[in-house]
């Protein structure tokens, strides 16, 4: 009996505590709901945190409301730049809901916007693992995967020849005594594992990318080498002895080279390695044990070049027309691509672009023989140091074939040791692209045998730079040679530095002080060169404006007459003076001359959405050259307070006659949120006004393409010489390959093109967001991919094809995880889904 009272009191106390807790939970829930009603999301969020900490059993009931509150509060914190508070809220939320894919995905989206791509990828990846059917998380993961694990990783790992030669060179070095190895820029760790398998005692590997470092850890562990390879999440320039590695190593292996050899910082890395991480190099004549000396694989490189004619490079880097759909381009506006303009800027920008020249649409024509640009010895510290400070070398190359000088194409031979080498030449079957230096700013690009192509080459800012490209004609060469000296040998040019110096820039036009340089992306230059695009838009806009004119004229004259009667003046103005203008808005991304073209079509008030000052100045100069009255062309962002609210009325009492939207990205994908933008745009149009394009049809076909397979995923262990890498890196494969040139893609068509999808911007009920399409197989083979492109209809008669030869758009392709054997005469059913501007295509079996 004596023991029953304390128990009773405890029970009573527990009951009172539970009742108090329940009341607090109930009040907090009411307060949270009230705060939500008045949009006080921060306080609502705090109340929900209290509720869930006191009553975890309510998680399921309040989950969706809690998510909504979290996301709205996070938006406010983001707008206020309270980043730490925002991240803190998500961490609290994930403690309560650790397996909630929606919260994981939202956290990833915020991190991605802040620039934390590695961390964002982790959350997207987790969200997909939690719910493989969560399409938003999948699309986010695919987008970030392209940033984090660039597609060349797959291509290089599938390059058996490259893997075999690197393995042989490393094996040879280790056998000769280089037993301690540092792998700089380890990637998946494949070179480190080659070294360990070859018998190296100590192997260290450094990788700066968090994603690639974690991937390498998994790969090394899967291959049971984690005990023998020490992985460091750092860049080699930050490695210290003995903090990271106990002592200097005898061998550095690296493949930190890009298409232009130096672009990934190999020179800087190796200077630091020779000074701080490697044993001293063996001097000539010494034959002692290699373990006492340092060496680098690759040992050296020879860089080669060739002057080429290539229409595809030309149309992406030079504006080759003087008139666009009736618009004159003045000579005082000089368009340049970033690859060329980087010569004169202080920014460290790659001074070249890259192309797989063996697959460039239309091919290329060699205008000179292949010539040697430079050699570099990676085992010579002094030579590496002198590269950045050395004066540019002047080179003169004889022309062997007449044609248009479009670019200097560059490749290299990587000499791994005295026996093993790799070439990145376009004639080799290799994973490598070539560096391309577009030629711009010449008075005349036509060259012929007898001419010489002059240039200066250097290694500034750790980039291979080819500058001051000019053409020396035969007649000019002879005149200068005579006045220079009587020495006949000078006519051969060869390596005569004095003659090269005297003749440099003879045909290089110098920029005039009044010129406006306008730097455009290569896709923007290709767009300017796309004549059918601009002529199509001009015709379509003209038709719409013509159809609106009678109505506008009637309305305006009616209003004018009423005003005259009420004022009793009896005076009249010309129709031209009384007509209200048509308002045209172009919100396509990047540089666009469509507003200027619209301005030529009568009483039009065109608005451009370009952001950059140099683009606005260029458009003003073009308008001026075409005799536009001042202030005809307006820049819309000057009238819009919030850039995110780009789509609004031109004036409070006016509507747009035409709105031009960007529906397709240059990559070949549908623009994000395009259907939402179209819905807003429809509400902003006057009666009879149009959105351009009015609708878009998506087309595709079945193909067999080994190339697409190899560019999308590592094809088993055979390619990586028995090492188990594929399952790990293939987690980062994406189902859609972008920036394709279908005209030059190595593939075998297995069907005719079929319509897959309709996106209707003017008539939304005609959209086909989910549909099944039957495709007739006209050739037997392995179905590996479904490339797709678009027909953009400005109206029923005017159509733009994104796969045409003049198109500035590239194409894209869905790549199947598992190829399907198909037989001629068979009929396949494709399931197409369009969700939030993302398209998925699956084969129903």
Swiss-Prot record:
Catalysed reaction equations from the record: L-arginyl-[protein] + 2 S-adenosyl-L-methionine = N(omega),N(omega)'-dimethyl-L-arginyl-[protein] + 2 S-adenosyl-L-homocysteine + 2 H(+)
TPR repeat spans: 25-58, 67-100, 101-134
GO CC annotation: cytoplasm; nucleus
Keywords, sorted A to Z: Cytoplasm, Methyltransferase, Repeat, S-adenosyl-L-methionine, TPR repeat, Transferase
Enzyme Commission number(s): 2.1.1.320
Subcellular location: Cytoplasm
pH dependence of this protein's activity: Optimum pH is between 7.5 and 8.0.
Record-linked Pfam families: PrmA (PF06325), PRMT_C (PF22528)
Top-rank lineage group of the source organism: Eukaryota
Temperature-dependent activity: Optimum temperature is 37 degrees Celsius.
Residues making up the signal peptide according to the UniProt record: none
Protein role: Arginine methyltransferase that can both catalyze the formation of omega-N monomethylarginine (MMA) and symmetrical dimethylarginine (sDMA). Specifically mediates the symmetrical dimethylation of SF3B2. Involved in the regulation of alternative splicing of pre-mRNA.
Family: Belongs to the class I-like SAM-binding methyltransferase superfamily. Protein arginine N-methyltransferase family.
Name of the protein this chain belongs to: Protein arginine N-methyltransferase 9
Organism name: Homo sapiens
The encoding gene: PRMT9
